């Protein structure tokens, strides 16, 4: 069952308007999609934080705005880099019968025998881009490493999809490997892939007051 968020429309994107919304416990946002008119909105910061805790960044949400309900995905979320406060959100309305591309967290599960023998676990991919129907988006993609010995790798081709989604990576791409102990100082921990960017650019909202 999708998490429900209440939203209200806002008239403009002036700095004073954005400041007022944030000071009153809201977060400015935009709603966009192929079959909906772009709308400047705001939602409760507390309710959005709760939705993120309960469903994660990739969960399907029901956004209520202007007497209408939209099935949406949270495509971009901006936070204050120093304080961590939410600043802006982009919601994309989706067609439940049309597949979407989305980045999903990779979570390694199990204990690798190679690590117990002194090997070093290196994770190369922290997210996977997948193509999936909105209702089938997994909260995380679990990858079992319980069979990995020193020198073993697990690749994209080893991921079990159960026929619910397609992975937009080459099967040979390495997700994780167990390095020999002497290579520990040479580990490249890997960088988390950037989430996809929505078409809407309004998220930066720095337009000065007119």
Swiss-Prot record:
<dbReference type="InterPro" id="IPR020056">
    <property type="entry name" value="Rbsml_bL25/Gln-tRNA_synth_N"/>
</dbReference>
<keyword id="KW-0687">Ribonucleoprotein</keyword>
<dbReference type="Pfam" id="PF01386">
    <property type="entry name" value="Ribosomal_L25p"/>
</dbReference>
<dbReference type="InterPro" id="IPR029751">
    <property type="entry name" value="Ribosomal_L25_dom"/>
</dbReference>
<dbReference type="InterPro" id="IPR037121">
    <property type="entry name" value="Ribosomal_bL25_C"/>
</dbReference>
<feature type="compositionally biased region" description="Basic and acidic residues">
    <location>
        <begin position="201"/>
        <end position="210"/>
    </location>
</feature>
<dbReference type="InterPro" id="IPR011035">
    <property type="entry name" value="Ribosomal_bL25/Gln-tRNA_synth"/>
</dbReference>
<feature type="region of interest" description="Disordered">
    <location>
        <begin position="175"/>
        <end position="210"/>
    </location>
</feature>
<dbReference type="GO" id="GO:0022625">
    <property type="term" value="C:cytosolic large ribosomal subunit"/>
</dbReference>
<comment type="subunit">
    <text>Part of the 50S ribosomal subunit; part of the 5S rRNA/L5/L18/L25 subcomplex. Contacts the 5S rRNA. Binds to the 5S rRNA independently of L5 and L18.</text>
</comment>
<comment type="function">
    <text>This is one of the proteins that binds to the 5S RNA in the ribosome where it forms part of the central protuberance.</text>
</comment>
<dbReference type="GO" id="GO:0008097">
    <property type="term" value="F:5S rRNA binding"/>
</dbReference>
<comment type="similarity">
    <text>Belongs to the bacterial ribosomal protein bL25 family. CTC subfamily.</text>
</comment>
<protein>
    <recommendedName>
        <fullName>Large ribosomal subunit protein bL25</fullName>
    </recommendedName>
</protein>
<keyword id="KW-0689">Ribosomal protein</keyword>
<dbReference type="InterPro" id="IPR001021">
    <property type="entry name" value="Ribosomal_bL25_long"/>
</dbReference>
<dbReference type="InterPro" id="IPR020930">
    <property type="entry name" value="Ribosomal_uL5_bac-type"/>
</dbReference>
<dbReference type="GO" id="GO:0003735">
    <property type="term" value="F:structural constituent of ribosome"/>
</dbReference>
<keyword id="KW-0699">rRNA-binding</keyword>
<dbReference type="InterPro" id="IPR020057">
    <property type="entry name" value="Ribosomal_bL25_b-dom"/>
</dbReference>
<dbReference type="GO" id="GO:0006412">
    <property type="term" value="P:translation"/>
</dbReference>
<dbReference type="Pfam" id="PF14693">
    <property type="entry name" value="Ribosomal_TL5_C"/>
</dbReference>
<keyword id="KW-0694">RNA-binding</keyword>
């Amino acid at each position: 069952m999708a998490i429900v968020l209440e939203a209200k429309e806002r008239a403009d994107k002036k700095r004073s308007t954005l400041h007022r919304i944030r000071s009153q416990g809201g977060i400015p946002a935009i709603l966009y999609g192929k079959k909906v008119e772009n709308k400047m909105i705001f939602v409760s910061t507390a309710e959005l934080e709760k939705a993120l805790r309960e469903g994660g960044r990739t969960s399907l949400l029901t956004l209520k705005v202007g007497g209408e309900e939209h099935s949406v995905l949270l495509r971009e979320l901006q936070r204050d880099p120093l304080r961590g406060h939410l600043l802006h959100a982009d919601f994309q309305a989706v067609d439940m019968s049309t597949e979407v591309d989305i980045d999903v967290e990779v979570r390694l599960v199990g204990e690798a025998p190679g690590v117990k023998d002194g090997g070093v676990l290196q994770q190369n991919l922290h997210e996977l881009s997948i193509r999936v129907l909105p209702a089938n988006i997994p909260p995380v993609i679990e990858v079992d490493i319980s069979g990995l010995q020193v020198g073993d790798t697990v690749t994209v081709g080893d991921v079990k999809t159960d026929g619910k989604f397609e992975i937009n990576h080459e099967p040979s791409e390495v997700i994780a490997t167990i390095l020999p102990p002497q290579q520990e100082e040479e580990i490249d921990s890997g960088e988390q892939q950037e989430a996809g960017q929505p078409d809407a650019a309004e998220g930066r909202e720095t337009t000065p007051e007119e």
